[in-house]
Amino acid sequence: MKNTFSRLFGFGDKESEFELQDESHEEIDKKVYEEIQEIPIVNITPNRYQPRTVFDDARIEELALTIRTHGLIQPIVVRQYEDDKYEIIAGERRFRAATKLGWEKVPAIIKNLNDTETASVALIENLQREELTAIEEAVAYQKLIELHNLTQEALAQRLGKGQSTIANKLRLLKLPEEIKNALLEKSITERHARALIPLKNEELQLKVLQEIVEKQLNVKQTEERITKLLEEAKPKRKAKQKAVSRDTRIAMNTIRQSLQMVADSGLNVNSEEEEFDEYYQITIQIPKKK
């Protein structure tokens, strides 16, 4: 299937190196080798828009061994931004592997792209490889939105992804730096990180992060812990309490006052108070006729 990212993001034919599927092998070889140049490694700088922030040294070492055995099959892609100064558009892992091998020059295809095009190609090229961490992917989506003034829905349509996928990734960017770093270092999974979002309180989020790492909580255990914290944070409803006095003297005086009020009304009320070990007893006699 032909790569459609160039058309979708308005690059025209500037990413044609990614769209060679419809050409014959002879045409491909002729076209590619005409454009390849050997560029001194010291004149090449990484892409400032590179979404990948963590490079696995072991994977770079493996790639270097493969290149040493089979050569660099796919040249890197660069743009020239000053005389004899080049910026990588695609292929930073290959560039790092060649540097590790001690190469002085590296085969490269030079493309004439502006800043926006360079950033977009670098971001898209990395997104297609599916090796980015969740945070790196979120950063790539955010940069594409800003570069092309897109909504989340529009970006999702252009990338062939669900809008919820884009939204869920972007929510991760609101988490504290410590949690984003844990994602980058793969100390926690994306689902762990997403579970922390409802807590809102940064102090609580970091507290649970520490528990996840130290106790090696799985996602279900993390969600249960967070649910408990959210329940504890809810304001407690105060139960209505009847005013009950445990002071027997107040109770006795209240009864006596009531009896006096009845007597003052003209009724001849007889009352008798008795005290026992466990209780007081008041016997009241009210005549049926006045």
UniProtKB/Swiss-Prot annotation:
The keyword Phosphoprotein does not apply. It comes from the Bacteria. The keyword Cell division applies. Its main location: cytoplasm. Keywords: Cell cycle, Cell division, Cytoplasm, DNA-binding, Septation. Pfam families: HTH_ParB (PF17762), ParBc (PF02195). It is found in: Cytoplasm, Nucleoid. GO terms for biological process: chromosome segregation; division septum assembly; positive regulation of sporulation resulting in formation of a cellular spore. InterPro entries: Chromosome_partition/occlusion, HTH_ParB/Spo0J, Nucleoid_occlusion_protein, ParB/RepB/Spo0J, ParB/Sulfiredoxin_dom, ParB/Sulfiredoxin_sf. Gene3D superfamilies: 1.10.10.2830, 3.90.1530.30. Signal peptide: none annotated. One of its GO terms (molecular function) is DNA binding. Residues 153-172 bind DNA. GO terms for cellular component: chromosome; cytoplasm; nucleoid. Belongs to the ParB family. Effects nucleoid occlusion by binding relatively nonspecifically to DNA and preventing the assembly of the division machinery in the vicinity of the nucleoid, especially under conditions that disturb the cell cycle. It helps to coordinate cell division and chromosome segregation by preventing the formation of the Z ring through the nucleoid, which would cause chromosome breakage. This is Nucleoid occlusion protein. It comes from Bacillus cereus (strain ZK / E33L).
